[in-house]
Amino acid sequence: MEQQAVIDFFDNAAAGWDAQLVRNEAVIGQILDNAGIRPGVSVLDVACGTGVLIPDYLRRGAAQITAIDIAPEMARIAREKFPQENVTVLCGDASQAHFPALFDCIVIYNAFPHFPEPERLISHLAGLLAPGGTLTVAHGFSRKALGAQRLQRSAAGRGAGRAVCKASDRHSADLQR
């Protein structure tokens, strides 16, 4: 699906997104544990949609949450839902976005297959990690479906620092810098 088609699809789905959302709290908890979401961290939520994980980051005490989605309507809804000072919601392409600071944790949840150039995305996001930071790609599909091997190749190809990709469970793959 081309990028504009993805934007149009999610813009059209935004109004009813939260109503159709199915959450598995145990799986989400495990994903956020693997991602290192704990008090005081800075988080970048990539393809945040309507802010599905923002309440989880807040409950876990994240100091700063930056969320980005390419679909304007998704970003608008997330911005309205979370007006807190420590939450910033942006509309833009995460594979090209620039930020004033690095992040302790970057999470892509249920969105990785929608990126047309996943290697480029991972390479760009790896450069936004603070030392010791973790990039977590998580989806309801298996580790194999996530393309964890592709994630590993992209991370290793950056050549900046030590990149370790591990399949932490069947729901996510983590890149640690």
Regions found by a protein language model. Give the residues of each.
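Short alpha-helix
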Residues: 161-177
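A short glycine-rich, Lys/Arg-flanked "PGG" loop and its adjoining helix->strand segment in the class I
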Residues: 119-131
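Conserved class I S-adenosyl-L-methionine
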Residues: 1-38, 52, 136-159
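Class I SAM-dependent methyltransferase SAM/SAH-binding core
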Residues: 44, 50-96
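A conserved beta-strand element that flanks and buttresses the S-adenosyl-L-methionine
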Residues: 107
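Short glycine-centered segments of the SAM/dcSAM-binding site in methyltransferase folds
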Residues: 42, 133-134
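Short catalytic micro-motifs in class I SAM-dependent methyltransferases
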Residues: 110-111
